Protein backbone atom coordinates (compact mmCIF):
# COMPACT_ATOMS: atom_id res chain seq x y z
CA UNK A 1 0.00 0.00 0.00
CA UNK A 2 1.32 3.40 -1.03
CA UNK A 3 0.25 6.69 0.53
CA UNK A 4 0.30 9.71 -1.79
CA UNK A 5 0.31 13.32 -0.61
CA UNK A 6 -1.08 15.91 -3.02
CA UNK A 7 -0.55 19.65 -2.55
CA UNK A 8 1.61 19.50 0.58
CA UNK A 9 4.20 22.21 -0.08
CA UNK A 10 4.98 23.99 3.19
CA UNK A 11 8.29 23.21 4.86
CA UNK A 12 6.70 21.79 8.00
CA UNK A 13 4.37 19.65 5.84
CA UNK A 14 7.34 18.17 4.00
CA UNK A 15 8.99 17.50 7.38
CA UNK A 16 5.88 15.58 8.42
CA UNK A 17 5.95 13.46 5.26
CA UNK A 18 9.65 12.78 5.70
CA UNK A 19 9.06 11.55 9.26
CA UNK A 20 6.63 8.91 7.96
CA UNK A 21 9.09 7.23 5.62
CA UNK A 22 10.44 4.84 8.25
CA UNK A 23 7.05 3.17 8.73
CA UNK A 24 5.00 3.88 5.60
CA UNK A 25 5.51 3.87 1.84
CA UNK A 26 4.80 7.57 1.32
CA UNK A 27 5.06 9.49 -1.94
CA UNK A 28 4.59 13.13 -2.95
CA UNK A 29 2.49 13.58 -6.09
CA UNK A 30 4.56 15.52 -8.59
CA UNK A 31 2.76 17.18 -11.50
CA UNK A 32 5.07 17.10 -14.57
CA UNK A 33 5.86 20.39 -16.26
CA UNK A 34 4.25 19.32 -19.53
CA UNK A 35 0.97 18.57 -17.70
CA UNK A 36 0.98 22.03 -16.13
CA UNK A 37 1.60 23.60 -19.53
CA UNK A 38 -1.23 21.63 -21.15
CA UNK A 39 -3.53 22.57 -18.27
CA UNK A 40 -2.76 26.28 -18.66
CA UNK A 41 -3.33 26.06 -22.42
CA UNK A 42 -6.68 24.29 -22.12
CA UNK A 43 -7.80 26.59 -19.32
CA UNK A 44 -7.06 29.57 -21.56
CA UNK A 45 -8.98 28.00 -24.44
CA UNK A 46 -11.83 27.08 -22.10
CA UNK A 47 -12.42 30.72 -21.24
CA UNK A 48 -13.45 31.29 -24.86
CA UNK A 49 -15.94 28.41 -24.96
CA UNK A 50 -19.55 28.36 -23.70
CA UNK A 51 -18.92 25.24 -21.53
CA UNK A 52 -15.84 24.23 -19.49
CA UNK A 53 -13.46 21.74 -21.06
CA UNK A 54 -13.14 18.40 -19.16
CA UNK A 55 -9.58 17.91 -17.95
CA UNK A 56 -9.93 14.70 -15.91
CA UNK A 57 -7.81 12.91 -18.51
CA UNK A 58 -4.83 14.97 -17.37
CA UNK A 59 -5.46 13.84 -13.79
CA UNK A 60 -5.47 10.22 -14.98
CA UNK A 61 -2.12 10.76 -16.69
CA UNK A 62 -0.59 12.03 -13.45
CA UNK A 63 -2.02 9.13 -11.42
CA UNK A 64 -0.85 6.56 -13.96
CA UNK A 65 2.63 8.08 -13.90
CA UNK A 66 2.81 7.44 -10.14
CA UNK A 67 1.51 3.88 -10.42
CA UNK A 68 -1.48 4.28 -8.08
CA UNK A 69 -3.56 1.19 -7.26
CA UNK A 70 -7.03 0.64 -5.72
CA UNK A 71 -5.50 -0.20 -2.33
CA UNK A 72 -3.51 3.04 -2.11
CA UNK A 73 -4.41 6.22 -0.21
CA UNK A 74 -4.42 9.82 -1.45
CA UNK A 75 -4.17 12.54 1.22
CA UNK A 76 -5.11 16.07 0.14
CA UNK A 77 -5.35 19.36 2.03
CA UNK A 78 -8.05 21.94 1.49
CA UNK A 79 -5.65 24.80 0.85
CA UNK A 80 -4.28 23.36 -2.39
CA UNK A 81 -7.16 21.20 -3.62
CA UNK A 82 -8.60 23.75 -6.05
CA UNK A 83 -5.23 24.91 -7.37
CA UNK A 84 -4.18 23.84 -10.86
CA UNK A 85 -5.09 20.29 -11.77
CA UNK A 86 -5.23 18.95 -8.21
CA UNK A 87 -9.00 18.41 -8.18
CA UNK A 88 -8.69 16.42 -11.42
CA UNK A 89 -6.00 14.23 -9.87
CA UNK A 90 -8.16 13.61 -6.80
CA UNK A 91 -11.31 12.85 -8.79
CA UNK A 92 -9.57 10.19 -10.93
CA UNK A 93 -7.50 8.53 -8.18
CA UNK A 94 -8.54 4.86 -7.94
CA UNK A 95 -7.76 4.29 -4.26
CA UNK A 96 -9.03 5.63 -0.93
CA UNK A 97 -9.23 9.44 -0.92
CA UNK A 98 -8.90 11.62 2.18
CA UNK A 99 -9.23 15.39 2.62
CA UNK A 100 -7.66 17.06 5.67
CA UNK A 101 -9.22 20.47 6.39
CA UNK A 102 -6.65 22.39 8.41
CA UNK A 103 -8.05 25.92 8.17
CA UNK A 104 -11.51 27.42 8.66
CA UNK A 105 -13.77 26.88 5.63
CA UNK A 106 -17.49 27.27 4.95
CA UNK A 107 -20.23 24.81 4.04
CA UNK A 108 -20.18 25.91 0.40
CA UNK A 109 -16.60 24.70 0.07
CA UNK A 110 -17.23 21.40 1.86
CA UNK A 111 -20.35 20.67 -0.18
CA UNK A 112 -18.46 21.39 -3.41
CA UNK A 113 -15.66 18.91 -2.69
CA UNK A 114 -17.21 16.28 -0.41
CA UNK A 115 -18.14 14.03 -3.32
CA UNK A 116 -14.48 13.69 -4.36
CA UNK A 117 -13.46 11.98 -1.12
CA UNK A 118 -14.19 8.87 0.89
CA UNK A 119 -13.49 10.70 4.17
CA UNK A 120 -13.19 14.36 5.14
CA UNK A 121 -11.48 15.32 8.41
CA UNK A 122 -10.97 18.60 10.26
CA UNK A 123 -8.73 19.53 13.19
CA UNK A 124 -11.35 21.95 14.54
CA UNK A 125 -14.10 20.36 16.71
CA UNK A 126 -16.63 23.15 16.18
CA UNK A 127 -16.10 23.02 12.43
CA UNK A 128 -16.66 19.26 12.52
CA UNK A 129 -20.06 19.71 14.18
CA UNK A 130 -21.05 22.62 11.95
CA UNK A 131 -20.05 21.03 8.63
CA UNK A 132 -20.60 17.34 9.46
CA UNK A 133 -17.01 16.19 8.96
CA UNK A 134 -14.89 13.86 11.08
CA UNK A 135 -12.60 15.03 13.88
CA UNK A 136 -8.88 14.36 13.61
CA UNK A 137 -6.18 15.40 16.07
CA UNK A 138 -3.81 18.11 14.87
CA UNK A 139 -0.45 16.61 13.91
CA UNK A 140 3.05 17.72 14.81
CA UNK A 141 5.61 17.60 11.96
CA UNK A 142 8.17 15.59 13.93
CA UNK A 143 8.32 12.34 15.85
CA UNK A 144 8.89 12.44 19.60
CA UNK A 145 12.56 11.48 19.14
CA UNK A 146 13.16 14.13 16.48
CA UNK A 147 11.46 16.78 18.62
CA UNK A 148 13.59 15.80 21.60
CA UNK A 149 16.73 16.19 19.51
CA UNK A 150 15.61 19.63 18.31
CA UNK A 151 14.75 20.70 21.86
CA UNK A 152 18.21 19.68 23.05
CA UNK A 153 19.66 22.27 20.67
CA UNK A 154 17.44 25.00 22.15
CA UNK A 155 19.03 28.36 22.80
CA UNK A 156 16.45 29.17 25.48
CA UNK A 157 17.81 30.77 28.62
CA UNK A 158 15.44 28.68 30.72
CA UNK A 159 14.57 31.72 32.82
CA UNK A 160 10.88 31.57 31.90
CA UNK A 161 11.04 35.17 30.71
CA UNK A 162 11.70 34.95 26.96
CA UNK A 163 8.37 35.15 25.09
CA UNK A 164 7.67 34.91 21.37
CA UNK A 165 4.74 35.52 19.03
CA UNK A 166 4.82 35.04 15.27
CA UNK A 167 1.77 35.21 13.02
CA UNK A 168 -0.31 37.25 10.63
CA UNK A 169 -2.36 40.08 12.05
CA UNK A 170 -5.81 38.72 11.08
CA UNK A 171 -7.43 41.32 13.32
CA UNK A 172 -5.64 39.99 16.40
CA UNK A 173 -3.09 42.75 16.96
CA UNK A 174 -5.02 44.52 19.75
CA UNK A 175 -5.01 41.32 21.82
CA UNK A 176 -1.38 40.56 20.98
CA UNK A 177 -0.33 44.06 22.04
CA UNK A 178 -2.24 43.75 25.33
CA UNK A 179 -0.46 40.46 26.03
CA UNK A 180 2.89 42.02 25.14
CA UNK A 181 2.32 44.85 27.61
CA UNK A 182 1.34 42.44 30.39
CA UNK A 183 4.46 40.35 29.81
CA UNK A 184 6.66 43.43 29.59
CA UNK A 185 5.44 44.51 33.03
CA UNK A 186 6.62 41.14 34.34
CA UNK A 187 10.12 41.82 33.07
CA UNK A 188 9.86 39.44 30.12
CA UNK A 189 12.01 39.67 27.01
CA UNK A 190 9.69 39.97 24.01
CA UNK A 191 10.34 38.53 20.55
CA UNK A 192 7.05 39.46 18.85
CA UNK A 193 6.46 39.55 15.09
CA UNK A 194 2.98 40.50 13.82
CA UNK A 195 2.86 40.15 10.04
CA UNK A 196 0.92 42.96 8.37
CA UNK A 197 -2.11 42.00 6.31
CA UNK A 198 -5.32 43.65 5.08
CA UNK A 199 -6.71 43.67 8.63
CA UNK A 200 -3.86 45.82 9.95
CA UNK A 201 -5.14 49.29 10.81
CA UNK A 202 -2.37 50.82 12.88
CA UNK A 203 1.11 49.31 12.75
CA UNK A 204 2.96 48.79 16.02
CA UNK A 205 6.69 48.36 16.68
CA UNK A 206 6.05 44.60 16.55
CA UNK A 207 4.60 44.61 13.02
CA UNK A 208 6.73 43.23 10.19
CA UNK A 209 6.13 43.14 6.45
CA UNK A 210 6.74 39.49 5.59
CA UNK A 211 6.16 36.09 7.15
CA UNK A 212 9.21 34.12 8.22
CA UNK A 213 10.04 30.70 6.75
CA UNK A 214 9.31 27.73 8.99
CA UNK A 215 12.96 27.15 9.88
CA UNK A 216 13.21 30.70 11.23
CA UNK A 217 9.91 30.30 13.08
CA UNK A 218 11.23 27.06 14.55
CA UNK A 219 14.41 28.79 15.67
CA UNK A 220 12.36 31.45 17.47
CA UNK A 221 10.22 28.78 19.11
CA UNK A 222 13.20 26.78 20.34
CA UNK A 223 14.81 29.93 21.72
CA UNK A 224 11.75 30.95 23.74
CA UNK A 225 10.51 29.95 27.17
CA UNK A 226 6.91 31.05 26.59
CA UNK A 227 5.01 30.84 23.30
CA UNK A 228 2.07 33.16 22.66
CA UNK A 229 -0.93 32.34 20.46
CA UNK A 230 -4.15 34.23 19.80
CA UNK A 231 -6.79 32.15 18.04
CA UNK A 232 -8.76 33.58 15.14
CA UNK A 233 -12.46 34.29 15.64
CA UNK A 234 -14.35 31.01 15.27
CA UNK A 235 -11.24 28.85 15.68
CA UNK A 236 -11.46 26.19 18.39
CA UNK A 237 -8.98 23.55 17.24
CA UNK A 238 -5.37 23.35 18.34
CA UNK A 239 -2.64 25.09 16.40
CA UNK A 240 0.97 24.04 16.01
CA UNK A 241 1.78 26.32 18.96
CA UNK A 242 -0.01 23.95 21.34
CA UNK A 243 1.95 20.99 20.01
CA UNK A 244 5.25 22.88 20.02
CA UNK A 245 4.57 23.59 23.68
CA UNK A 246 4.12 19.89 24.44
CA UNK A 247 6.91 18.45 22.29
CA UNK A 248 9.55 21.10 23.04
CA UNK A 249 8.79 21.48 26.74
CA UNK A 250 7.70 25.13 26.48
CA UNK A 251 4.94 27.14 28.13
CA UNK A 252 1.99 28.64 26.26
CA UNK A 253 -0.01 31.80 26.82
CA UNK A 254 -3.12 31.25 24.71
CA UNK A 255 -6.66 32.50 24.18
CA UNK A 256 -7.90 28.93 23.57
CA UNK A 257 -9.64 27.82 26.78
CA UNK A 258 -10.26 24.36 25.30
CA UNK A 259 -6.82 23.20 26.48
CA UNK A 260 -8.22 23.12 30.03
CA UNK A 261 -10.33 20.12 28.98
CA UNK A 262 -7.30 18.04 27.95
CA UNK A 263 -5.42 15.50 30.04
CA UNK A 264 -2.18 17.31 29.19
CA UNK A 265 -3.40 20.55 30.76
CA UNK A 266 -1.13 21.89 33.51
CA UNK A 267 -1.62 25.41 34.95
CA UNK A 268 2.15 25.66 35.13
CA UNK A 269 2.37 25.11 31.36
CA UNK A 270 -0.74 26.92 30.06
CA UNK A 271 -2.06 30.39 30.86
CA UNK A 272 -5.47 31.19 29.34
CA UNK A 273 -5.64 34.87 28.43
CA UNK A 274 -9.07 36.30 29.21
CA UNK A 275 -9.90 33.40 31.56
CA UNK A 276 -7.07 33.12 34.08
CA UNK A 277 -6.55 36.01 36.45
CA UNK A 278 -3.79 38.46 35.48
CA UNK A 279 -2.64 38.17 39.09
CA UNK A 280 -1.63 34.57 38.34
CA UNK A 281 0.72 35.53 35.50
CA UNK A 282 3.85 35.77 37.73
CA UNK A 283 3.08 32.32 39.17
CA UNK A 284 2.71 30.90 35.65
CA UNK A 285 6.05 32.36 34.55
CA UNK A 286 7.83 30.91 37.57
CA UNK A 287 6.15 27.47 37.58
CA UNK A 288 7.86 24.20 36.67
CA UNK A 289 5.29 22.18 34.72
CA UNK A 290 4.99 18.40 34.88
CA UNK A 291 6.70 16.60 31.95
CA UNK A 292 4.33 15.44 29.21
CA UNK A 293 3.99 11.65 28.90
CA UNK A 294 5.24 9.77 25.85
CA UNK A 295 1.73 8.40 25.30
CA UNK A 296 0.30 11.91 25.08
CA UNK A 297 2.97 13.04 22.64
CA UNK A 298 2.48 10.01 20.39
CA UNK A 299 -1.20 10.91 19.96
CA UNK A 300 -0.14 13.97 17.96
CA UNK A 301 2.65 12.45 15.87
CA UNK A 302 2.40 11.95 12.09
CA UNK A 303 2.57 8.18 12.69
CA UNK A 304 -0.52 8.21 14.93
CA UNK A 305 -2.42 10.27 12.37
CA UNK A 306 -1.45 7.94 9.55
CA UNK A 307 -2.33 4.82 11.55
CA UNK A 308 -5.86 6.15 11.89
CA UNK A 309 -6.18 7.07 8.21
CA UNK A 310 -5.02 3.58 7.24
CA UNK A 311 -7.35 1.88 9.74
CA UNK A 312 -10.37 3.83 8.45
CA UNK A 313 -9.77 3.33 4.74
What are these regions (language model features)?
Residues 67, 113, 219-220:
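Structural alpha-helical scaffold elements that stabilize or flank donor/cofactor-binding regions
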Residues 202-209, 214-310:
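Catalytic binding pocket for nucleotide-activated donors in carbohydrate/polymer assembly enzymes
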Residues 23-30, 41-46, 95-97, 116-122, ...:
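Active-site regions of enzymes building and remodeling cell-envelope glycoconjugates
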Residues 1-96, 102, 119, 259, ...:
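N-terminal pre-catalytic "stem/leader" segment of glycosyltransferase-like enzymes
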Residues 70, 116, 222-223:
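Alpha-helix C-terminal capping/helix-to-coil transition sites in glycosyltransferase folds
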Residues 32-35, 174-211, 215, 257:
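Catalytic donor nucleotide-activated moiety binding site of glycosyltransferases and closely related
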Residues 10-12, 104-108, 121-129, 194-200, ...:
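Short, polar loop motifs at secondary-structure junctions
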Residues 80-184, 308:
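Catalytic core of nucleotide-activated saccharide and alditol-phosphate transferases
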Amino acid sequence: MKIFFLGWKAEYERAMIESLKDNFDVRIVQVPGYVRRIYRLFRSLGKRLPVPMPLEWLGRRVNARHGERPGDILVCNEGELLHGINAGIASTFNGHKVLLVRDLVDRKFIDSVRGLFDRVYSFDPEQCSLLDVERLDQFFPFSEAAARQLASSSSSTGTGRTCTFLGRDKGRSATVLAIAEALRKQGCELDFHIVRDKSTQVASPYHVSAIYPYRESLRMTLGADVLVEVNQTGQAGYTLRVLETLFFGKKLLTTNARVKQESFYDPGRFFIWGVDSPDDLPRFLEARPTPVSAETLYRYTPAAMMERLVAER
